[in-house]
Amino acid sequence: MLYDFCDGWLFHDGDIQTLPPEMKGPVYMQTKTECRMRGPASLHYCDAPDDYGVTDTRALHRELTHERWERVTLPHDYMINAELPKTGNPARGYAVPHAAWYRKHFTPTTVQGKHTERIFDGVTKDCEVYLNGVLLARHHTAYTPFSVDLSDVIRPGEENVLAVRVDNAEPEGWWY
């Protein structure tokens, strides 16, 4: 079944320091697996636009955060509002390159035991895709679609958070 995932995203313009992953148990220390991230990639990160500035997140059961998040619909181009100093690179429309974060909260109901993937039509430029704090994919070009398998990490019937960190620090054509 296909779902439209364009609505209901949260966006933060700028990079956010990601905390190191929680420590793995001694049995798994030698494995090459990722462990759950903290910070904006995690399931329990406080990104609600209405909760901006909340200093006591115990009632929210979420990590404390001071970043402002806004609601957006995809496709979304955060560089269109970027700072445009005349000393910038004209190939980028003079925009200053920087990273940003997108997050999507969703509760799947019909995925139990099924292969589940999310298809991205394109993300400019480098990106990392997380589900519930687990790094699932990296993609390094703006002009190609890619898919991410969510099957092993998705939680049917529970809230899930898909987080995407986008970084356009490397040169990439920006033509408006």
What do the predicted segments below correspond to?
Residues 1-84, 163-174:
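Accessory carbohydrate-binding/adhesion or oligomerization-edge regions at the termini
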Residues 83-91:
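N-terminal glycine-rich cofactor-binding segment
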